Amino acid sequence: IENKKIDIVILCLGANDMLRGTNPNIIKQNLKQIIERFQEKNITILLAGMISLETFGNKYKKSFDEIYPELARKFRISYLPFLLDGVALNPKLNLRDGKHPNALGVRQISINLEKKLISLLKKD
């Protein structure tokens, strides 16, 4: 990002970390550092959130699910609560692995992002 003209970035990280059971505090700290770097460069951020599966228990899920709204509030950035809304766990919208979206799933993700992005583009 050092020598590039970037106006807006969609930040959505942490899903694979969640699937591996990474400590939510580590995920949050990593996202925080990324957000701070983008804000230092005056780059507008759309934080696209994820929601934890219950694989690692309720305590883990609660901690993970709080990451994205907390960071959005703290840094006053635009926030989409769940990037995969309508896509996650829908076999018709995912590849055989059940975790990654197929072409139709990507289309739904684009729809999920559209209103937030249009709103951000109008601000610039």
Residue ranges and their predicted role:
Residues 1-124:
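Alpha-helical cap/lid subdomain in secreted, periplasmic
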